């Protein structure tokens, strides 16, 4: 049976979930990956209000939608980051506080623990959930990084300096992961520039830093790997059991006018000079056929969650065509050898 196709609501948080849900259904999706900003999934309210999660499910069911994950990228970013004025725009006021770096980090850490508890409560309330269902809930997100600014290794950067960054990540995230463990929730880091893991090598190093904590894995997204030159299909095979969730998202590279490189040239997305940019699914350079084959090989059975971004295209048009693209692309794996019928018993 093909995997459910869902839409990540993070880029749609200007709409209430009540406004967005019928649009998601009309675009052809089976469900949503709920962002923890806007009013889509408010973690504090989920814990404080007795009927909050039930009402969310009622709204989704009204429009024939399900949910398989929630995502709190924005708060997670602040756990390890070197905080500056940009963070104020993406953080809840109670996390930002006075903007002092260590205070922001600590409040972000507590909010991620709250996210785990809220996610567990939400998925426990899923309509039709069997009492014997002990499957982990999924929270996707970012970690931030105290060493991203050293990615180019100048001033000269030795491994001891980088080790300190991975140690800082472990110190801040292991206590969070312990709450995830207590709540039976998996945390899926979206491997992405600005995070502690942004390619295959750094993903291995991040896993090692948290001693392969069972609750730490990945939200696979090829769009953040391809333009870097990372083998995005190998990532699937390298981390198969740690891929808890994924984003279907496209990107092209090798474009532009030659004046802007892989670092972006301090240009905006959709600037025609850019070397790379995110595209609607099927319009970029990611080989999704190879991705589906690899996902079948590792027996990934979770949703195919479309994270739609394309600065050149209307989002309703783009998200609709992306849903159609994913549905045509996905297929169930073969359950028997194709040549089995040749043999006599």
Which residues are covered by each model-predicted region?
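A structural motif
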Residues: 29, 34, 65, 122-127, ...
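C-terminal helical cap(s) of enzyme catalytic domains, especially alpha/beta-barrels
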Residues: 315-335
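Glycine-rich, proline-tolerant flexible connector loops at the mouths of alpha/beta enzymes
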Residues: 35-57, 61, 143-148
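Active-site-proximal loop/turn and secondary-structure-junction residues that shape catalytic pockets
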Residues: 11-13, 36-38, 73-76, 143-147, ...
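Active-site acidic/histidine proton-transfer and metal-coordination neighborhood
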Residues: 14, 19, 23, 62, ...
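Conserved beta-strand positions in the central sheet of alpha/beta enzyme cores
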Residues: 33, 69-71, 128, 140, ...
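Boundary/entry segment of secreted carbohydrate-active catalytic domains
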Residues: 1-15
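Acidic/histidine-rich catalytic cores of soluble enzymes
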Residues: 4-5, 31-32, 70, 153-285, ...
């Amino acid at each position: 049976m093909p995997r459910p196709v869902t839409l990540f609501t993070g880029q749609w948080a200007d709409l209430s979930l009540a406004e967005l849900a019928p649009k998601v259904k009309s675009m052809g999706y089976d469900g949503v990956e709920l962002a923890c900003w806007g009013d889509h999934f408010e973690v504090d309210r989920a814990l404080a209000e007795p009927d909050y999660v039930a009402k969310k499910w009622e709204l989704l069911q009204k429009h024939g939608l399900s949910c398989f994950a929630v995502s709190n990228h924005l708060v997670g970013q602040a756990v390890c980051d070197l905080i500056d004025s940009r963070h104020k725009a993406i953080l809840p006021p109670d996390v930002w506080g006075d903007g002092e770096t260590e205070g922001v980090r600590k409040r972000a850490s507590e909010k991620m623990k709250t996210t785990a508890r809220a996610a567990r409560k939400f998925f426990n309330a899923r309509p039709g959930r069997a009492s014997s269902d002990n499957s982990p809930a999924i929270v996707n997100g970012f970690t931030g990084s105290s060493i991203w600014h050293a990615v180019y290794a100048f001033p000269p950067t030795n491994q001891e300096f980088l080790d300190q960054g991975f140690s800082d990540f472990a110190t801040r995230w292991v206590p969070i992961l312990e709450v995830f463990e207590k709540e039976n929730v998996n945390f899926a880091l979206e491997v992405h520039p600005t995070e502690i893991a942004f390619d295959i090598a750094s993903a291995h190093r991040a896993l090692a830093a948290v001693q392969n904590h069972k609750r730490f894995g990945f939200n696979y997204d090829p769009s953040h790997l391809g333009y870097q030159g990372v083998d995005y299909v190998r990532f699937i095979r390298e981390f198969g059991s740690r891929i808890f969730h994924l984003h279907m998202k496209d990107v092209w590279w090798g474009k532009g006018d030659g004046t802007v490189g892989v670092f972006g040239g301090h240009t905006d997305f959709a600037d025609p000079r850019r070397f790379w940019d995110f595209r609607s699914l099927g319009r970029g350079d990611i080989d999704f056929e190879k991705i589906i084959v690899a996902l079948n090989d590792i027996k990934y059975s979770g949703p195919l969650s479309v994270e739609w971004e394309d600065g050149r295209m209307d989002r309703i048009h783009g998200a609709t065509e992306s849903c159609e693209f994913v549905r045509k692309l996905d297929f169930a794996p073969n359950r028997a050898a194709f040549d089995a019928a040749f043999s006599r018993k």
